[in-house]
């Protein structure tokens, strides 16, 4: 019984290990949720307003923030990758801006740390539906 149980447990944990390794090796956030019409409009609006999201691919809060937008809207955002080993990393810019945590939003020259709901982001940027 023990001989069967140990390989079985190893096999059952393998997909999670492969999945985690795969995401880690991506070096970028992988957003899977679908966008709404409103989230796409908001993303396009914040680009025009010069809003920047400072992020790190390995940051769970950054992924949570990005999932609120969905994958289509996320592609519209001005996202600066701060992780040194991230794809298109701009670590020096993040250091120059004194980014202390992720995600950090730059709105009207002000840095705001943390996950913002789409409603909060709309209010802070003046977005109207």
Feature locations, PLM:
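Structural micro-motif
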Residues: 95-106
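C-terminal segment of classical bacterial N-terminal signal peptides
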Residues: 14-17
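N-terminal leader/targeting and pre-domain segments
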Residues: 20-44
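Sec-dependent N-terminal signal peptides
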Residues: 4-12
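Structural microenvironment flanking redox-active thiols in thiol-disulfide oxidoreductases
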Residues: 84-93
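Local sequence-structure signature of Cys/Sec-based thiol-disulfide redox active-site neighborhoods
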Residues: 35-76
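Non-catalytic, surface beta->alpha helical segment in thiol-disulfide oxidoreductase systems
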Residues: 106-129
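Structural recognition of the beta-strand scaffold that forms the well-ordered cores
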Residues: 52-55, 78-80, 104-106, 111
């Amino acid at each position: 019984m023990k001989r069967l149980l140990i390989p079985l447990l190893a096999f059952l944990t393998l997909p999670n290990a492969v999945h985690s390794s795969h995401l880690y090796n991506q070096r970028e956030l992988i957003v899977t949720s679908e966008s709404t019409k409103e989230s796409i409009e908001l993303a396009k609006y914040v680009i025009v307003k010069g809003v920047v999201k400072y992020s790190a691919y390995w940051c769970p809060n950054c992924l949570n923030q990005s999932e609120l937008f969905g994958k289509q809207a996320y592609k519209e955002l001005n996202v600066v990758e701060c992780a040194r080993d991230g794809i298109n990393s701009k670590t020096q810019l993040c250091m120059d801006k004194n980014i202390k945590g992720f995600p950090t939003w730059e709105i009207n020259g002000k840095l705001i740390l943390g996950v913002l709901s789409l409603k909060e982001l709309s209010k802070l940027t003046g977005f109207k539906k």
